[in-house]
Amino acid sequence: MAKILANSIIFTIALFSLAKLLCSPYSINFTPSQLVLPIAIIGILPFILILLSSISKSNLPPGPLSLPIFGNWLQVGNDLNHRLLAAMSKTYGPVFLLKLGSKNLAVVSDPELANQVLHTQGVEFGSRPRNVVFDIFTGNGQDMVFTIYGEHWRKMRRIMTLPFFTNKVVHQYSNMWEEEMDLVVHDLRNGKAAAREEGIVIRKRLQLMLYNIMYRMMFDAKFESQDDPLFIEATRFNSERSRLAQSFDYNYGDFIPLLRPFLRGYLNKCRDLQNRRLAFFNNYYVEKRRKIMAANGEKHKIICAMDHIIDAQMMGEISDENVLYIVENINVAAIETTLWSMEWAIAELVNHPTVQRKIRDEISTVLKGSPVTEANLHELPYLQATVKETLRLHTPIPLLVPHMNLEEAKLAGYTIPKESKVVVNAWWLANNPAWWKNPEEFRPERFTEEEGGAAGRVQVDFRYLPFGVGRRSCPGMILALPILGLVIAKLVMNFEMTVAAAGLGKIDVSEEGGQFSLHIAKHSTVVFNAIME
């Protein structure tokens, strides 16, 4: 405190001296010699600011000089994307600190430090930062993904893991997954548009497939087609939720509390959407399961994940609201991110026909005519490498879901202030040329040859963290990886995928990001030429 007070006095004296000189009634008649002192003061003011900043914050990670009230917001802007933060790490090092209004943001861009944040010091950095919009969409942390680290998170994670995220669940539902995927293949084979030169945008059909997979697991419910009114309503609600939550438009009010009143209209729009969205989930799905369970009484058997979750609620472990926020998490975290990765994978396969052929050859050689199933995916290393390479090059959550330290913490010898937002630049870890050969290339072989071989000898490769690791890692990895592998295998074995006539030889894989997410900027138009069975 004494040091800060002394710095403030020095700075005040400097400013007062400058003001006195410039406001003097004789200032208009300054001689050159009289101007020397004010010019000198003006010249050294930036250095005084830097000195004061470095003295008062000597143990904080390095970072650009911040301004009062705004911090670094005016310098870096709203879009704190993975590429900008990677570029800044080249200047400020593997861990640096940004001041965004009233909030601290620590950025980690090194595998060893990622290990510290996510694993070794996983408890210290295991919480989640607050956000004015995500507070609305999570009911102030009543969910599992964005809640703070503690007893509520442990309870929600346990309740969600049993019906969704275990090997037993994967084996239980894998036949259903394949059934939904085979319907996609059937529709593509029988739809004339898929094989025409102009191709089709496959995203909507894959979206229906993923919604059916997750809604059958969650509610034992299925959408009949892309024109099903409930499917249209569900996707519309979730799309609007993603748009509002991922937008950068509300950052100014989140970073600077003084400006928050100007967000009133935006936040009201979020509240209105969330109320209607949760009512939709409750009225059409959750209450339906409650009625079925009540009608069956003691004879009821657990059919789907929601039955298990309602059981937990009826036993007093979680509230009615918690039930709905579990549904919220699955709709966003499990469906949308997997869909983005499928789009990236298909685009890269179209742009790399050699990879398609290698997958096809591997499946034919290894399985000798047997179909690809979840149970034999482990026998197909090149297919698995293709999934890994897709997630490496196009990490769907490039900065992972942000972490937070509830108390002051140490990292790499630096002090991380209490309640700092801490992000790990997982995209840069997986695309830094210091650690990866030609990282901009889509080359699955890297995971079966030189780079993958070295990584395979360690338990966790902290250069490659598309799902995070440790306590707050994404539990959906156990579903996403086999689903991605099966979809790729079924498409490659049934079709030669090529670019549409208007595509000029390549699919555009430009990216578009939001607060956390990364997805392909333009949905791919693909020609599916059926392979004779």
From Swiss-Prot:
What is the induction comment? Answer: Up-regulated by methyl jasmonate (MeJA).
Membrane topology category: Multi-pass membrane protein
Cofactor(s) essential for the protein:
heme
Q: Which Pfam families match?
A: p450
- Can you tell me which residues bind heme? 474
* GO molecular-function terms, A-Z: heme binding; iron ion binding; monooxygenase activity; oxidoreductase activity, acting on paired donors, with incorporation or reduction of molecular oxygen
Protein localization = Membrane
Task: State the EC number(s).
Answer: 1.14.-.-
Protein keywords: Heme, Iron, Membrane, Metal-binding, Monooxygenase, Oxidoreductase, Transmembrane, Transmembrane helix
Broadest EC class assigned to this enzyme: oxidoreductase
* Source superkingdom: Eukaryota
Gene Ontology cellular-component terms for this entry are:
membrane
Q: Which family does it belong to?
A: Belongs to the cytochrome P450 family.
Q: What is this protein called?
A: Cytochrome P450 CYP73A100
